[in-house]
Structures are given as C-alpha cells and as structure tokens.
C-alpha cells in the first residue's frame, strides 16, 4: 500500500541516489541579477508551463526584503534538469546575518558566485564567499550583465580570482570555471563575446563541476537550518539530511541545544520541487527536506 500524507494524497517515492543531486548556494550582491538568474534557471528546468507568467522576486518574498532589496531569510527552490535534481539555496547577502550564512552554506556542496560585469565583486559578498571557501565549497563564477555598455568582464574575472586568492582559497577552488552571460536576456556561455540562446551551459557546468552529496549510512540525522511557515500546519523544519534516511510517519528524537530530547513524529515529509514542496515517502542523506509535525524545534 502506498503511503499518503495528512491530506490523503499519495506520496512520491524518493530514490536514494545522491549522484543525481546537486546542492548549490547562490552568493550575490544586491542588484547583481540573482533573482532574474534563478527565474531563468527555473524556466530552463521546464517548471513553468507556457501559460504561467514568471513573477519577479521569486526568492525575495519576505516583506522586509521587498523594502530593503536584500535577501535575509534563505529560501530553497529546486529544478530538475537532465535527470538531475539541482537544489538552489539562497544566501543572506550581508554579514549582519552571519549565523544564518554559515548554517545555510552547510546545506550546499558548491556555490555560484554571481558578479556584475560592470561593478565587479562587491565588499558585501566577501564575507559570504569567505565562509563558503572556508568550509570547502567549490565555486562557479558567473559574470552577469555582460551586455551592459562599458562593462569589462575580463577585468572582473581577474578581480574575482584575486579576491579568492586573498581569501586563502585552495588550489582546487582557484581552478573555478567562469561563465559569462546575461540572465535578463536568458543566455550563458564560456565566452562573453559569443552569446547563446539559452542558459543550459550554466546548468551543464553545475552538474559537471559541483560534487554530488555523499550518502552516509546510519541512524537518520538532520540539522534544522531554517524554517518555513504554513497557516495550515504551522512551523516547518527545513534542513539537509546528514545521515541515513527519514521516512514519512517516522518517530524521531528532537535534540535541543540544552541537551534535552523529546520524542516527535514526522506527520509529513517533503522535498523541494520548483517553487514548492512535494510530499514524499522517504528522504535520504544528501537531500534537503521540510518536515511537518516537529514541535518546539530550534534552528541550528
């Protein structure tokens, strides 16, 4: 019998093949085109039907962010491309949210550094990039807005290399691929002078260069790194499964920072799919999930 969720819907089977998962964090200064890029990545993943309009500010849907134009509470979206699931993890763009930066980056296995072809790397992204390099994430550099007048993509690429070198990047991290393009005009390429007609070059490079998460066997374990909220089910715990496999309806132990432990039950298990979530039967090590039914949890 196929399990159902709390609404009675049948659950999807979630295969435990981490080779088909890529967890990637996006690091970008405000106005360097992060939201537009994610829009186009979602489109390339065929997540929008022809009759759907792509709304702006997919990631920036927090009221405070709309006012300030920065991303504070990290969001997760996911695309499927060439039989691979790419979990896109948004990062806070300011060091003011340092605690969240580290938690969010620990869900990723690589990062996209998005840089404006005219402005180059900005001081606000230095903190997040430094944290990403320190925990060993492999970077892909995307130099965006190369269609801007008077931009200088080659100089920006050199500035990014110098920044990473000064942040003590390893030799492997310094061997990063650089991708040029215009998210607004929906193209990415290995040469800024040679536009293409889509952004699949970027998606192919993510699959090729960013390592798949490792599947670690054992008792299931997850660090809650962020929360979502639904008026229907309340607080939702979000995190990357570190070890083992969680199943829908499973009894678990919630460990708090003070060392106390409480028995809980997973009422619904979800993975991210497009801009939303999909109820699943199980989630294995390496994937990012959202758990419903966990009461009194703490982030981190």
Where are these regions (language model features)?
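Conserved catalytic-core segments of large NTP-driven translation/proteostasis enzymes
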Residues: 165-299
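Conserved C-terminal guanine-recognition region of P-loop GTPase G domains, centered on the G4
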Residues: 105, 111-173
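N-terminal, positively charged nucleic-acid-binding surface of large information/translation enzymes
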Residues: 63-73, 77-78, 128, 134, ...
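P-loop NTPase switch module centered on the Walker A-proximal segment
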Residues: 2-115, 119-121, 159, 227-230
């Amino acid at each position: 019998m196929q399990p159902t969720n709390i609404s009675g819907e049948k659950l999807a089977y979630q295969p435990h093949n981490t080779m088909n998962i890529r967890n990637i964090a996006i690091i970008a200064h405000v106005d360097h085109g992060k939201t537009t890029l994610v829009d186009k990545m979602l489109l390339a993943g065929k997540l929008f039907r022809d009759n759907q309009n792509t709304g702006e500010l997919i990631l920036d849907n927090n009221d405070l962010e709309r006012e300030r134009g920065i991303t504070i509470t990290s969001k997760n979206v996911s695309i499927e491309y060439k039989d691979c699931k790419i979990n896109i993890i948004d990062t806070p763009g300011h060091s003011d949210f340092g605690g969240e930066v580290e938690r969010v980056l620990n869900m990723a296995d690589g990062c996209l550094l998005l840089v404006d072809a005219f402005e180059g790397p900005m001081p606000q992204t230095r903190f997040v990039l430094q944290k990403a390099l320190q925990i060993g994430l492999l970077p892909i550099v995307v130099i965006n807005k190369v269609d801007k007048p008077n931009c200088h993509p080659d100089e920006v690429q050199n500035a990014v290399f110098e920044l990473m070198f000064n942040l003590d990047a390893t030799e492997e991290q310094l061997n990063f691929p650089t991708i040029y393009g215009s998210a607004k005009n929906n193209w990415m390429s290995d040469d800024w002078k040679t536009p293409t007609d889509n952004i699949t070059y970027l998606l192919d490079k993510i699959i090729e260069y960013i390592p798949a998460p490792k599947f670690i066997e054992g008792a299931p374990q997850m660090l809650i790194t962020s929360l979502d909220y639904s008026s229907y089910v309340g607080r939702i715990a979000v995190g990357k499964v570190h070890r083992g496999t969680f199943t829908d309806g499973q009894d678990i132990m919630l460990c708090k920072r003070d060392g106390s432990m409480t028995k809980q039950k997973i009422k619904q298990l979800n993975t991210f799919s497009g801009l939303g979530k999909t109820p699943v039967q199980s989630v294995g090590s390496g994937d990012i999930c959202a758990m419903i039914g966990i009461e009194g949890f703490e982030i981190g």
